Amino acid sequence: MALGGLISNRNFGSFIGSGNGCQRLGKSGAEVSKLFPNALLCRNHQPLQASLHHESGHMRRSFGCFLQPRMDSVIRFRNSIKINRSRAYYKSEESDITEGVVPSADGSAEAILVEGNLQNASPWWQQFPRRWVIVLLCFSSFLLCNMDRVNMSIAILPMSQEYNWSSATVGLIQSSFFWGYLLTQILGGIWADKFGGKVVLGFGVVWWSFATIMTPIAARLGLPFLLVVRAFMGIGEGVAMPAMNNMLSKWIPVSERSRSLALVYSGMYLGSVTGLAFSPMLITKFGWPSVFYSFGSLGSIWFLLWLKFAYSSPKDDPDLSEEEKKVILGGSKPREPVTVIPWKLILSKPPVWALIISHFCHNWGTFILLTWMPTYYNQVLKFNLTESGLLCVLPWLTMAVFANIGGWIADTLVSRGLSITNVRKIMQSIGFLGPAFFLSQLSHVKTPAMAVLCMACSQGSDAFSQSGLYSNHQDIGPRYAGVLLGLSNTAGVLAGVFGTAATGYILQRGSWDDVFKVAVALYLIGTLVWNLFATGEKILD
């Protein structure tokens, strides 16, 4: 029986042989009769004439499946083989073989099998785009980043009771994280641009995870040890954003840039939600040290996955397909790692200063809301501490949702032909003017529910910044994306430190309306600077 009669209803592969293959042609043609592990048999319809053509090993590789041929009986002649019966077993499903003509005199020609329209050739997880594997790994690292950061805000309550810390001491402990965090913003960008994002981000996660695990031990040793460990944790987390930005600038094409960054940054928001939700449960059941031990241990699991699947750039990934490489690179060649940072050139560009100033204005309002929100809910809206804690989760959830919506909108606008400059200005204007509007309404609302809604809408519109200034570093200088983010985020962290302290000073002498007015003023300044000087064009090469 011919193989063509056994395998049907699927387009599986094709025969080629000397430019042509095998095809049934009635009595004057040839047909496929038998496949051996290392050979292909073509037979014409002349009596007892058959030819066996070997294709050592290559046939199986190009066929791309498991074929187990079996021959029940073969009668051998001096120059031919007569097939009484043959079978081929395909271990997945039946398939057709595309056939062609063999123009040789005896009905035979050298033939091989080539891979055709294979379906389900590999598991779905192997077909998943490699660039989005990198995005998901960065997303999960940012999830861990904020889980490990916010757990102290919950654990500090039982810790301060156990060790009799004053409010001033608690404030010192909370601020010690930023000592280290500030140190590695620019350094993290330099290291990532020189040595690759994989090394730097992997180092950062291991470093801050170890510091998280060491926190209970340091607290028992004494306050100075705890301050050092918290500063060390800040050092590790400080490299995360520059290293991530460096990697995505190499892995993600511009048409997917906004949504990929939005997804990664939403990991931070969801990390805060997860940390705020699970920390009280762990503390109640196992004690406050359990929060640090459990959250910190998750970093080791992430690091193993990072070592296995992450690469600093597409050219380092041996499993990256040529098709995906073309999508990522868009016809351009991958650049060599940065050896010298052109600081004078970078700092001479107005769009760079637009990034720095806008990042400062953005983070002033964001840090104030996220730091002082529980106090506002408790003192002004008269929610109890439990209610305040639950309501603090709402803005983080809102930001996670709207960051991804904004990313999708931005990439859609780019794909439809709107310039990157206009897209970045539109998205960041929403990220500035939205919070400014909703914060200005807080003095006019009459109910706590409306106040909570205004706060949530403020943070939701703020999340559009992920497709504005947070995506712009890769636009204007992809080779220096890590350094650029380190520069602007340093300004952002300083805004958080000074803004948080200034809010306390304002509240001692004024009101919450004054706090919100300062934030609104900075949002408006940021809008003006951004729209005057920002660009989406590459200015650093």
Curated annotation (Swiss-Prot):
Species whose genome carries this gene: Arabidopsis thaliana (Mouse-ear cress)
Function according to Swiss-Prot or TrEMBL: Inorganic phosphate and probable anion transporter. Ascorbate transporter bridging the chloroplast envelope. Transports ascorbate from the cytosol into the chloroplast. Requires chloride ions and the presence of an electrochemical potential across the membrane for activity.
Phenotype of gene-disrupted mutants: No visible phenotype, but decreased reduced ascorbate content in leaves and decreased xanthophyll cycle for heat dissipation of excessive energy in photosynthesis.
Family: Belongs to the major facilitator superfamily. Sodium/anion cotransporter (TC 2.A.1.14) family.
Gene responsible for this protein: PHT4;4
Keyword annotations from UniProtKB, A to Z: Chloroplast, Membrane, Plastid, Plastid inner membrane, Transit peptide, Transmembrane, Transmembrane helix
Name used for this protein in its record: Ascorbate transporter, chloroplastic
Domain of life (superkingdom): Eukaryota
Induction (UniProt): Expressed with a circadian rhythm showing a peak during the middle of the day (under long day conditions). Up-regulated by light.
Gene Ontology CC, one term: chloroplast envelope
Modulation of this protein's activity: Insensitive to dehydroascorbate, p-isoascorbate, inorganic phosphate, glutamate, ATP, p-aminohippuric acid or tetraethylammonium.
